[in-house]
Amino acid sequence: MQTDEPTGTATSAIRIPPLISLRTTLMVAGLLGNVVAVAAYGLFSRTERYGAVGNPDPGSFIGVAEPVGYFGASLSSALCLGALIYFVMMVWPQADGLIDAQAFRIHLAEERVSIGWLAFALTMVVVQAANDSGVTPAELRTGAALFNAITTSETSRAWIVVTICALLVTLTLRVIIRYSDHFVLLIPAVIGVIATAVTGNAGQGPDHDYATSAVIVFALAIAALSGLKITAALTEVTPSRAVLIVQVVCGVLALAYGAELVYLLSPGAAMIDSDFGRLGLVAGVLVTLVCFSDCWALVMGRPHSDHRTRLTALAMMAVTAATAAMSVQTAPRFLTHRFTAWDVFLGYELPQPPNIVRFFTVWRFDSLIGATAIVLGIGYVAGFVRVRRAGNTWPVGRLVAWLTGCVALVFTSSSGVRTYGSAMFSVHMAEHMTLNMFIPVLLVLGGPVTLALRALSAAGDGQQPGPREWLTWLMHSSVTAFLSHPVTNFILFVGSPYIVYFTPLFDTLVRYHWGHEFMAIHFLLVGYIFYWAIIGIDPGPRRLPYLARIGLLFAVMPFHAFFGIALMTMTSAISAEFYRSVNLPWLASIDADQHIGGAIAWSATELPVIIVIVALMAQWARQDHRVAVREDRHADSTYADDDLNAYNAMLRELSRMRR
């Protein structure tokens, strides 16, 4: 493919097999075998599944359709996500940003898979509503009956989210041919994969905060690994080393977080005595074998043979079937547990009010955000050491800023701040302001992209693009240009709190742990993008003049103050029904607690603004110093040139006079 970037991309070596081939036949046979197995399980376990929890039996059709539909939707979403990841990692755009003919064939395969995902997801909206209501599809023929069944089923509403994501992916793939658009499509693909996972067993009952964070990582790891394996089996492609590393990482994450989920949802003897536990063990064994195979190929530096590629793809297909069968039954832990309001809304108990000591001692580690912060800190240190060993310099102050931000992120997401913030509006607002106003400043001052570009090696001639090339493309892509535009920055940073807290959206988000995770990630990213435009040292598509950056900073601050004042002056509490349901015995008034939250939002902007102004002034002074030094050097060079020209002119004049 002709491009300004490194040549020798994977698309030139990709061979799309004929429609009917040996490997296609084997994959279809494996698919049909898994469908039959899942359908048989749904049929023969129907009485036990519904009887164990006392739910009405919706009939044989729904009893079989639910696990089969879940398997079909899970497999197609995994294949769609895996194909997108493969496309992003193995394909490189041409100079004009378009994809070539070979890559377009992969694009067409993604489009066809997304249509199947959409069909399964749409079907599951009705099937799940009928299953949770205990009625047959015929009883949902009227619009009112179907609407009522969907609104009372949390999982059915999750399938609506999946349907929207699948529709967005399908329609977009239908009209795009640019590489960057495939990168953006990873967002709805990821949301579609985790939407039903967070509303299932992991999102219910005691310790559901632990389980929800774990299932997000687990669902993404299993989907990505399954999709990459099946994509490799169907396209006859030899995965690059980078893809193999991603597969190993996904396998390790799936094993670690899957073990946590089995421990939380099927503890003790239930791990062996229940179908849920046994299916989990089978899936764990298969993932272990696949992960070991990938590790061996990575260490030996040899790609999988065609035979092993097919076997690992079939194994991950069976893992998807096992997890689908687990998802349609109630976890053993909940069958004998008596639920309390704290189990439903928090997942843990808060018998005592918060204080400084409990903020530092009451920990519930967030295995999603907290673990990510630890990985980011370790990765930064590794990059710092590599740059130093190469004989280059990197300011220690940036290292300190980044690590401080990572530590603050772990503390905010996993300490008593998050534990009490899920139940109290005032503490939640302190968490929000820290994630949105303070931590992003520290992370931006660390300059992680610049460090990564110095630490990562560039791909050589004839090699596939690597992480350094992907990062360079991302920082100068149209997506980054749009997000970093001052108008976009202003709207996101100012509008986010008003949209989240002054609309019914907060009523939904505050009830679920996935909602708290969403808010934390959203406010952290919005804050990072905003402060990157003001004090960021990393490369990007545009940079405002320093005076304009100061103007942008002071332009947004009054809106945050107005937001805090609005919270303090409201006559009714936000999400009062939720906070009354939690019913903290030591909280005297939820209205007074919201007033405190508003005061925190009003006053919490001062310290970050001071830090940003100091950093901005320092950057401005250094920039002026560099300009002055450059001008002085140029002036010295100019004077030297003038003297030389005058001397040469004198010599020419003397020569003329002699003649």
From Swiss-Prot:
Disulfide bonds: none annotated. Keywords: Cell membrane, Membrane, Transmembrane, Transmembrane helix. Pfam families: Caa3_CtaG (PF09678). It is found in: Cell membrane. Its main location: membrane. It comes from the Bacteria. The chain crosses the membrane at residues 24-44, 71-91, 115-135, 157-177, 183-203, 214-234, 242-262, 279-299, 311-331, 365-385, 393-413, 433-453, 490-510, 517-537, 550-570, 596-616. It is a multi-pass membrane protein. To M.tuberculosis Rv0102. This is Uncharacterized protein ML1998. It comes from Mycobacterium leprae (strain TN).
